[in-house]
């Protein structure tokens, strides 16, 4: 574990994540209440690379009905309490334990129907820190989900690129060229993999 986090109040949780231990509700509350975004990021990145290495899947201009795979979502922000978010995440984790049917999870800062088809600057009322925190905590707690997905139409290209260090390994959106998406992923030190509608590579 990096010595940088030796004095972090989340040090013990970083240790648990490194050891592959599942975090309980009390630990999740601590994550939600923490402002240590770097500690959250290191835990999420450990989980991300354990599951997917440096691979980052992407899909451009996906049709609304492009897949039969199961994807879960959660709206976060001012209209949803922290406890409601945690309840949602733990219910999903339990359901995934039982069924194993979900392919990916997408934390959303606003309703998907509000996404601009050609916008790449991000919309919504959350801050960048809140967005990264939502991505990281989702990755840390949903240890039985293979993919955490983000949309550059919601986050904007720059924050989407940063999210690749905070647990995200699957990108989607519209209004951007394939070359630009690949470049964004590669400049974040990741490997770009175009995916099909089922969450796998083409």
State the predicted function of each range.
Residues 1-42, 46-51, 97-202:
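Auxiliary Fe-S-binding modules of radical SAM enzymes
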Residues 25, 54, 70-71, 88, ...:
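Histidine (H) residue identity feature
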Residues 42-71, 158:
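N-terminal pre-triad scaffold of radical SAM enzymes
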Residues 59-61, 71-75, 105-108, 149-151:
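A cross-family glycoside hydrolase active-site/sugar-binding cleft signature
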Residues 63-98, 116-129:
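Conserved non-cysteine loop/helix-boundary elements of the Radical SAM core domain that shape
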């Amino acid at each position: 574990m990096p010595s940088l986090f030796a004095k972090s109040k989340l040090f013990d949780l970083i240790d648990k994540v490194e050891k592959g231990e599942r975090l309980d509700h009390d630990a999740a509350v601590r994550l939600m209440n923490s402002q240590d975004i770097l500690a959250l990021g290191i835990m999420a990145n450990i989980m991300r690379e354990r599951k997917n290495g440096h691979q980052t899947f992407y899909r451009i201009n996906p049709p609304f009905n492009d897949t039969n795979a199961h994807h879960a979502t959660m709206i976060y922000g001012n209209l949803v309490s922290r406890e409601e978010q945690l309840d949602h995440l733990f219910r999903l984790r339990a359901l995934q334990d039982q069924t194993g049917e979900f392919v990916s999870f997408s934390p959303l800062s606003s309703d998907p129907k509000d996404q601009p088809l050609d916008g790449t600057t991000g919309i919504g009322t959350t801050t960048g820190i809140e967005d990264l925190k939502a991505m990281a905590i989702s990755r840390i707690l949903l240890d039985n989900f293979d993919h955490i997905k983000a949309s550059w139409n919601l986050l904007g290209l720059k924050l989407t690129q940063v999210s690749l260090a905070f647990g995200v390994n699957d990108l989607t959106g519209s209004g951007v060229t394939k070359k630009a998406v690949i470049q964004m992923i590669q400049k974040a030190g990741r490997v770009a993999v175009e995916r099909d509608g089922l969450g796998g590579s083409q």
